């Protein structure tokens, strides 16, 4: 009688991705309330740093409204090519664990971890290892990983 293989899937989500990249690339922005976005007064917030979220600012909010909530916010333009570059680095890390990776967006991916326990140990340990490796190869960016 064969034992049925436990299916495991990981949802990897980069934390405040655009804003975190801007703070990493521009140390003077670290610890400051950063809005990544553009489009003038009718533009929207593409990303909000953790420092600005405490003012009630969040992604998809009109920039004008965000600046009312936090007048001292620092607005930086979107650099999609840079975010895509970092995203590729993260996906490379995930693919070093499994060929079954599905990119959901520039800052999210799904990894099929079914059967990988034989190679990497318990999936919880594997998730912690991935988080450490992502942080290392990106120069300090963090991610959250959900398991199902």
Across the structure, where does each feature detected by a protein language model lie?
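Gly/Gly-Pro- and Ser/Thr-rich, intrinsically disordered tail segments characteristic of DNA damage-repair
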Residues: 1-148
């Amino acid at each position: 009688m064969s034992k049925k293989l436990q299916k495991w899937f990981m949802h990897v989500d980069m934390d405040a991705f655009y804003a975190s990249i801007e703070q990493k690339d521009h140390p003077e922005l670290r610890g400051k309330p950063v809005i990544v976005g553009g489009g003038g007064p009718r533009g929207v917030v593409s990303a909000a740093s953790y420092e600005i979220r405490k003012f009630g600012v969040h992604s998809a909010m009109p920039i004008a409204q965000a600046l009312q909530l936090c007048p001292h916010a620092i607005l930086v333009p979107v650099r999609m090519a840079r975010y895509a570059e970092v995203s590729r680095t993260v996906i490379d890390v995930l693919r070093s664990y499994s060929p079954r990776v599905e990119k959901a967006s520039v800052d999210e991916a799904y990894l099929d971890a079914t059967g990988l326990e034989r190679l990497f140990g318990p999936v919880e340990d594997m998730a912690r290892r991935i988080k450490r490796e992502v942080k290392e190869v990106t120069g300090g960016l963090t991610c959250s990983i959900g398991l199902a």
